[in-house]
């Protein structure tokens, strides 16, 4: 229990002690009845309340892509400075192209050879057809010529496919950046023999840092609350699907750019009982770094027609939370309530209070359930009301 809560509980207890002592205090010296004690109250008026949901969050890269060799050979050159920005398509590494250039030339020759054979088979098939028409040659010889022509046509297609493969392999000797981002350290030194298997093909990685992801988690209760508030927001025509977040650093300073929640998990984590959430935020100056811990605060969430009371008004007993309410006869009543959420200066009350109720905020120690008080509405010319209360008390004497 906090110090303020302890004080409020003590105040509540003291009020009951005063109540027990009322018969002894009923008559002041000289037989005059003392005036009811003066207390400050707030009039309960439902209003829209912004609610803050704040979570521990972690920064993750928007994309982190491994750069791997797609052909083997000797690594000739590294064309970038480690840890610097590169653009998508920029050549990062060069692998010895000589063997792949030779394979390309071989494939080109095979295409030419296949084309020549195909053209010859076309001519042979045409002559065979003419001889059959002249009844000089059998149909079987003609059919064989047609089959040879079709086989040579397929051979041309296969040779061209080999040529495309050779062209691709030669192009793969220039390893380019798949995305724009920051490079990591090289994994293989120049002059090394590299392969295409998982253990030897990794050359470096590129990390995209603008934008970045902010990952955090809701509890199941908070997820339900936010879903309800988003539904209410959507019912009023507001955009309920794009919740904004503010990012706070460890020193309490806010990041320059707001983020937008773009993903919410469809199921709870069975180990933590939380719902994974992800937001995306601009990071043009790379102020946010993958792995960095921050605080994420959800913005623009409001509870419609909410009831709040100052923190000083809410007290705790063994039976639960309660406040002191002044009824229409200016008599103090104990009102059990349910505090839904602690705000900056107030408590959001989910049950127990209604519009128009007057809740005691100051002078609780003087308030006794079942006894009258002089209520002064807090924040509405307190001094004038206090003077008016004194005059009313004087008139009763």
Swiss-Prot record:
Annotated localization: Periplasm
GO MF annotation: an example: transmembrane transporter activity
Chain coiled-coil ranges: 98-139
Cited SUPFAM superfamilies: HlyD-like secretion proteins
Gene Ontology cellular-component annotations: periplasmic space; plasma membrane
Keyword Transport: yes
Presence of keyword ATP-binding: no
Keywords noted in UniProt: Antibiotic resistance, Coiled coil, Periplasm, Signal, Transport
Pfam families in the record: HlyD_D23 (PF16576)
Induction section of the entry: Repressed by BepR.
NCBIfam families in UniProt: RND_mfp
Name of the protein: Efflux pump periplasmic linker BepD
Lineage of the species this protein comes from: Bacteria, Pseudomonadati, Pseudomonadota, Alphaproteobacteria, Hyphomicrobiales
Gene symbol of the encoding locus: bepD
């Amino acid at each position: 229990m906090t110090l303020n809560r302890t004080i409020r509980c003590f105040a509540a207890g003291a009020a009951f002690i005063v109540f027990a002592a009322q018969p002894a205090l009923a008559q002041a010296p000289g037989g005059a009845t003392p005036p009811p004690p003066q207390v400050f109250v707030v009039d309960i008026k439902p209003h829209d309340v912004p609610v803050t949901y704040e979570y521990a969050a972690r920064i993750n890269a928007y994309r982190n892509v491994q750069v791997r060799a797609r052909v083997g050979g000797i690594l000739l050159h590294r064309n970038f400075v480690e840890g610097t920005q590169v653009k998508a398509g920029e050549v990062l590494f060069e692998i010895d192209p000589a063997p792949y250039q030779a394979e390309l030339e071989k494939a080109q020759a095979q295409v030419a050879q296949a084309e020549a054979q195909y053209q010859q088979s076309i001519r042979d098939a045409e002559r065979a057809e003419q001889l059959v028409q002249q009844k000089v040659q059998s149909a079987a010889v003609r059919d064989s010529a047609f089959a040879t022509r079709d086989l040579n046509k397929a051979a041309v297609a296969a040779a061209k496919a080999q040529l495309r493969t050779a062209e691709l392999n030669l192009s793969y000797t220039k390893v380019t950046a798949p995305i724009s981002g920051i490079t990591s350290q090289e994994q293989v030194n120049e002059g090394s023999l590299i392969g295409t298997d998982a253990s030897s093909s990794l050359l470096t990685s590129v990390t995209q840092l603008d934008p970045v992801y902010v990952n955090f988690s809701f509890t199941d209760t908070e997820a339900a609350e936010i879903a309800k508030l988003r539904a209410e927001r959507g019912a009023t025509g507001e955009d309920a699907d794009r919740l904004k977040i503010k990012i706070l650093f460890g020193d309490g300073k806010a990041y320059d750019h707001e983020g937008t929640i773009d993903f919410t998990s469809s199921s709870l984590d069975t180990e933590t009982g939380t719902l994974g959430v992800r937001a995306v935020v601009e990071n043009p100056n790379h102020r946010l770094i993958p792995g960095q811990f921050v605080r994420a605060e959800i913005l623009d969430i409001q509870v419609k027609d909410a009831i709040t009371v100052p923190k000083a008004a809410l007290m705790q007993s063994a039976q639960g939370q309660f406040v002191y309410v002044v009824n229409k006869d200016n008599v103090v009543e104990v009102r059990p309530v349910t505090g839904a959420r602690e705000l900056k200066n107030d408590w959001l009350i989910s049950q127990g209070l209604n519009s128009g109720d007057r809740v005691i905020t100051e002078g609780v120690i003087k308030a006794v359930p079942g006894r009258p008080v002089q209520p002064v509405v807090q924040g509405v010319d307190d001094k004038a009301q206090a003077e008016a209360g004194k005059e009313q008390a004087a008139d009763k004497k």
